[in-house]
Amino acid sequence: MSRAPDRIAACFDALRHSGRKALIPFITAGDPSLEATVPVMHALVRAGANIIELGVPFSDPMADGPTIQRSSERALGRGAGLAYVIEAVQEFRREDATTPVVLMGYLNPIEIHGTRRFAETAVAAGIDGVLLVDLPPEEADETRAIFTEVGLALIALASPTTGEARLDMLCSTAQGYLYYVSFSGVTGAADRLDTHAASDRLRQLRARAGAPVVAGFGIKDAASAAAMAVDADGVVVGSALVAALADASDVRSARKRAEDFLQPLRQALDAG
């Protein structure tokens, strides 16, 4: 099987050359509706998204706070499993061949699917990377090897409590980008970000990692996005966007909410 194009590397290269930071929104596939997922993805790109993280709904999302847990439950109730997520990316790719798409989720659905079969299916659909929050880096070699064979990036997570030995491993094996969790806890839980502590860590990581470093968890608005982006290659915004989309009444409303939410963040990043 041929390797996938490296859209993630091309994206960060273009951003670096233009002096801009990556804006990476997270949405749960299948929420606020099955029909809204792909239109919302396109709306986010129009509003300035550089990469899209698409959450794979899971019944026990232990790393996620209440907002994304509820979103995942709603999506599962509509039948949004892994097969639906892959089909959504296929549909997205009919109009957008360049914006990277990264799946974020848990190991169980992929193991049920079969890791190699999943990797090949994902690449064929146009998926660029996968972030598995419950896959310890010490146990990731086999999965990484399968993904690497087909050109699928295994995105890694680092946090303020990550030990030095594990951090060395993450930095040396980073693919696509390294996702720095800016505080310890579940998604959406931070009322106020400690940007000074996060900035110190981000500078260290960028000096050590063999891939771009992005910051996420707790970024809620334009101000927090701009603050975190100073020492990162990009920022991820998830829970606040998921909350903004949650009760959209139809596809048109979901598209508008996505654009209205993301545009100020894009403007803040570009102004910084």
From Swiss-Prot:
Pfam family, one: Trp_syntA
Gene3D superfamilies xref list: Aldolase class I
PROSITE patterns, per the entry: TRP_SYNTHASE_ALPHA (PS00167)
EC number: 4.2.1.20
Active site positions: 53, 64
This protein's GO CC annotations: cytosol
Top EC class, one word: lyase
Molecular-function annotations in GO: tryptophan synthase activity
Keyword line: Amino-acid biosynthesis, Aromatic amino acid biosynthesis, Lyase, Tryptophan biosynthesis
Presence of keyword Repressor: no
Pathway(s) annotated for this protein in UniProt: Amino-acid biosynthesis; L-tryptophan biosynthesis; L-tryptophan from chorismate: step 5/5
GO BP of this protein: L-tryptophan biosynthetic process
Catalytic function, reaction form: (1S,2R)-1-C-(indol-3-yl)glycerol 3-phosphate + L-serine = D-glyceraldehyde 3-phosphate + L-tryptophan + H2O
Family as reported in the entry's similarity comment: Belongs to the TrpA family.
HAMAP family: Trp_synth_alpha (MF_00131)
NCBIfam families hit by this protein: trpA (TIGR00262)
Function (record text): The alpha subunit is responsible for the aldol cleavage of indoleglycerol phosphate to indole and glyceraldehyde 3-phosphate.
Subunit architecture: Tetramer of two alpha and two beta chains.
Name recorded for this polypeptide: Tryptophan synthase alpha chain
The encoding gene: trpA
